[in-house]
Amino acid sequence: MKIKTLETFCNQYVGFVRATAEDGATGWGQVSPYNADITCQVFHRQVARYALGTDADAIETLVATIPEREHKFPGSYLMRALCGLDTALWDMRGKRKGKSVCELLGGKPRPFPVYASSMKRGEITPEAEAARFIKLRDQCGYTAFKFRVGKECGHDEDEWPGRTDAIVPQVRKALGPTARLLVDGNSGYTPKKAIAVGRMLEDHGVCHFEEPCPYWEYRWTKEVADALSLDVTGGEQDCDLALWRFAIDMRAVDVMQPDVCYLGGIARTLQVARWAKDAGLPITPHSANLSLVTVFTLHLMGAIENAGPYVEFSIEGDDYYPWQDGLFTPALVAMDGKVPIPAGPGWGVEINPDWLAKAAYQKSELA
């Protein structure tokens, strides 16, 4: 059945996509968060025009063809927009078949382990970070926690002098020896400094060092990964499949972290997961907010063979992400350190009509 209309509902931060087929079947997806209003313009200009009138179930063909048709415009915005089409069509496919996307991919909806992911760095002291981790452990059953070290794109600087050396032992002492600790460097270090920080992390039993070097410096990151025994991880920023192949072939990191929305949707992320599986590498995607990206990631991780042990689950509320409240129902909630993969058809969630009523609207349709 052919795609008849493609609609977007957006604000600056979030953009939902509704795809409707000629028989009235619908599916909901989402472009990547942040500057979503710009991404929705790209969607209508450079994505929708190629999708209208094509087979709504030909997801893999569409997401492979559109970047070729727009080959003069490679890069992040096109992939962020493409995700809106891909994910809307996966939702439609699931609803047609009466299955969740997880089931379409060969998995089974179930509670999936998550790690408590802090987005704060300069806004919080080491003591306060450790205290909220303890509270979340006791309330939600988390056994794994991620926090920030260094300074974002920091050229070896710390967010403030001594912060990294303080927060790592502080969190370890607070949570005890059995908690799994993960840290994110956010492109902060040169290899020499990253290795030195990594040695300190190893001394405190940290198991995951994310994006230690500028993400575009693959050889720098590989140098760090080769030098350390803990897992060096990365890949969230990468939206080019050729770069993914390059990073996997050179084993730039120990754990691959694609972001479903940045990369262009489920079909492209599945390709990365297959390449990683063939290389013996696990996948632990980037899903750093509670928009639909975490829903997409839960479904994916419930199905792929090389899924890592956890899905990233943001612990930030309205003080940090005021825009993520009330987007869809049911809301994602962590209990016993797990979040259920939504079990209904498609993504298993409903977009909030009150949110849609306030959003900027645009429609592309068959002539």
What is each PLM-predicted segment?
Residues 11-14, 30-37, 71, 117-121, ...:
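Glycine-rich phosphate/pyrophosphate-binding beta-alpha loops
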Residues 20-97:
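Metal- or metallocofactor-binding catalytic centers and their adjacent structured scaffolds
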Residues 1-28, 32, 318-325:
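Structured beta-strand/loop patches that form or line metal/cofactor-binding pockets in enzymes
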Residues 317, 321-367:
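C-terminal extensions of enzymes
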Residues 111-112, 116-228:
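Metal-dependent enolase-superfamily TIM-barrel catalytic cores that perform enediolate-based chemistry
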Residues 45, 61, 199, 205, ...:
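Shared catalytic-loop signature of beta/alpha-barrel
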Residues 29, 114-117, 143-147, 181-185, ...:
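Hydrophobic faces of well-ordered beta-strands that scaffold small-molecule active sites
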Residues 3, 24, 47, 85, ...:
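Conserved, mostly hydrophobic/aromatic
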